[in-house]
């Protein structure tokens, strides 16, 4: 579909927000993956799942709701320890206490039932298991179809507007294609859902670009003015 091809084209570029901002911070939090059983939620085209195998993971399962993503992942990455499965995040099988490490990169804000998802994750993790995920900041997801960056007549950015923050629920945004559905939750809802399902929060990062990242992609300077 159109979304997949545009997404794939953007990710193929060396200098993109994912490579320069989100992923470097994500990777700093990775535990040792040697001999671990891994589940990657929202695996996309499977690159991170393959990375886990290369880092010594025993078995990695990648799930994604997009057939195009899963089909591409299976073509790109072939290994006896890799399994890719098309399944909606909310419908993933509960694997009681069998997973050492669960990862998810920028997918949780597309999931309608966050409480159910985290409950399943908590059940699936073994004792001492780790969940590492990234998602769009609630400051960014709050607005309901309004232009967030306010500009002057010359087009210069004045400030980032936040509205409807406490009004949780469905949002639509135009990202790559029109009317992409996502879900806004407050920071307290996100954190308390983790805590209430028995997970212990060890670290939170709100990424800022490095000097090198700014040289490669100057538009990243906006990230100093609001979380991403």
Where on the chain are the PLM-derived regions?
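A conserved beta-strand element that flanks and buttresses the S-adenosyl-L-methionine
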Residues: 103
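Short catalytic micro-motifs in class I SAM-dependent methyltransferases
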Residues: 106-109
